[in-house]
Amino acid sequence: LQTVATQRLTAVNYRLLATEVMDTLQRDSRVRAELVRSIGAKADFGHMKVLADRSTMPADVAAMVHRLYSPHEVVINEDVLSFDVAAFQVDLICVPPIEYDTARDYLAFNVLGSLMGRTANRMGFKYGHSGLRYKLRDGDFLVADIPVTTKMAAAFDFLGYDYRRFTESFHALEDVFFYAASSTYFDPVAYLLQARGYRDRACYQKRQNYRFFIEWLKTTGTAAGSSAGLQREHHLQRAMSQFPDFADALKRSQEAFAGSRRRKQIFNGQIVAELTGLEGEALGQLMRRLHDAYPGGRPEFVAWLDQLQDHELAVLHAYIEDMAIDASVRTKSLHSTSD
């Protein structure tokens, strides 16, 4: 919050306020919501996190918050609404229904989700609010962001974590640290801030418990897991074997990208310009006409490009040249008519 001074609460007072906040939210509305799980021995709290299913909320969530809690301030940051109740900050985290179960596990137990996310990243995957995902890239270009699984027990198992132990909760922050380091794929190197980009370093330096974890690693001398050295390609093959739907989606994305790249190689502005001598606005108009004037329109033109073999490109070039001549004839005809 930016203008309202807020306080920290002891665990006892936090739980009393949490009961009041949740009772108010669920008594006066049909919102599906719950407190984000916290560490059992946490002595005091600086804010309260409430996870809510966006589909069960009214269109104007801020108006609902004002009506229910009469806060002095409401700050909206993407899908998080922060507001004050009894001089204490409440963060209402709104997620789509498909992400509710994954988000409730990812957000639980303080910094654990972020720590597990570093192990996932080291393996070539992303672990977050929407479960386990894979980003298909071509260099720095993001080709596709593909779901691997939204079943959290399966995601934990893939990352080398015991989901049953996770569901038993954690008493102290050190228990969370031990758990984060328990994966056979865990590597302490993944957490060193100097190995991160500037934005990541700035972000994580502000997170006290993340810094505590790094100090804990140094103090305990925690070693890498027995399988930490496995390459990303190994984990990708594992994921394709364990999650058939992901394997199918990955294959489709790879094929679509390969098709798109080849289309750009055989049909682009430079090729059309070289064949026709056109440039600027005239070139742009012809490019659009080549798509739209093809029998069946743009989708059929793209399908035709995809089926053309390298030895058949002369047919494409002839089509381009014919369309350029046709466009030129049309332009001259229009000029003569206007004269």
Each language-model region and where it sits:
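Helical (often loop-to-helix) elements that flank the catalytic cores of nucleotide-handling enzymes
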Residues: 55-70, 105-109
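Catalytic metal-binding acidic patch
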Residues: 41-62
